[in-house]
UniProtKB/Swiss-Prot annotation:
Descriptive protein name: Protoheme IX farnesyltransferase
InterPro entries associated with the record: Protohaem_IX_farnesylTrfase, UbiA_prenyltransferase, UbiA_prenylTrfase_CS, UbiA_sf
Stored PROSITE patterns: UBIA (PS00943)
Pathway membership: Porphyrin-containing compound metabolism; heme O biosynthesis; heme O from protoheme: step 1/1
Catalysis: reaction(s): heme b + (2E,6E)-farnesyl diphosphate + H2O = Fe(II)-heme o + diphosphate
Organism: Bacillus licheniformis (strain ATCC 14580 / DSM 13 / JCM 2505 / CCUG 7422 / NBRC 12200 / NCIMB 9375 / NCTC 10341 / NRRL NRS-1264 / Gibson 46)
Amino acid sequence: MAETRITADTAMNGQIEETTAWKDFLALIKVGIVYSNLITTFTGMWLAFYFSNLSFLGNLDIVLFTLAGSSLIIAGSCVINNFYDRDIDQLMQRTRTRPTVTGKIQPSQALWFGILLTALGFIMLLMTNLTAAGVGFVGVFTYVFLYTMWSKRRYTVNTIIGSVSGAVPPLIGWTAVQGSIGVEAWVLFLIMFIWQIPHFLALAIKKTEEYRAANIPMLPVVHGFEVTKRQIIIWIACLMPLPFFLGGLGLPIVILGTVLNIGWLVCGLVGYRSKNIMKWATLMFVYSLNYLTIFFVAMVVFTLFKIG
């Protein structure tokens, strides 16, 4: 796996980029997406233990099956996405070195590998309960079929559709413990669903020309920056009431969530009239990453000593 390989990046600058088999594997499964979704999966699972007064340490089998199963179905879905999108990935700077584009991994190999990972993930989730596996199926179906194969290349609402799948992980974590979806779990789902839209719209502004070259109808490509900026502000505003539904976690979490929401909204409004749209989009994108990490990690930390 440590064998060094060579990738020719000839389409843009003719330079040679060295990659390893391990690096190719991480790119194939989109390891960044796997990691970020595991944070929200773990948070959903942790809070399910918290609200049900169950022991975390006494249910390590559920913890391991949930995290392993979630990792596998997310990674498998990403591999299938790489397989399907290899024709447009070669047209975009940030995706053109993926192994499905460079030929490091053959399309058929990627497809079957993605299917295998996803199947193994479902088996792992079934070891917790049927509900968790069912929720996982909704996430996979939405991402692979409704987003990747149907809406991504056709409609500007592709971001909204894709955000459904990205909001599923905390529900997987929650249902793996409780077997049903509680109010707090739906709040986590809504936070993740709404959060993704301004997050990815900010990225779409930064990568507008790449999306245009690949003929992907992202909102800034079709309707321009002004419409996209307004949509970002509107979706951030929709986050404002959600922390108040997490009162069961304590006042500090409600305050933290509210402060994070206000901070993001203020950043958006202050920079809304900025002539440097790329600087503004970068600020919004970076803030969104910090928002997710801080808020979801804090929900675990603030309840850390209340779970056995």
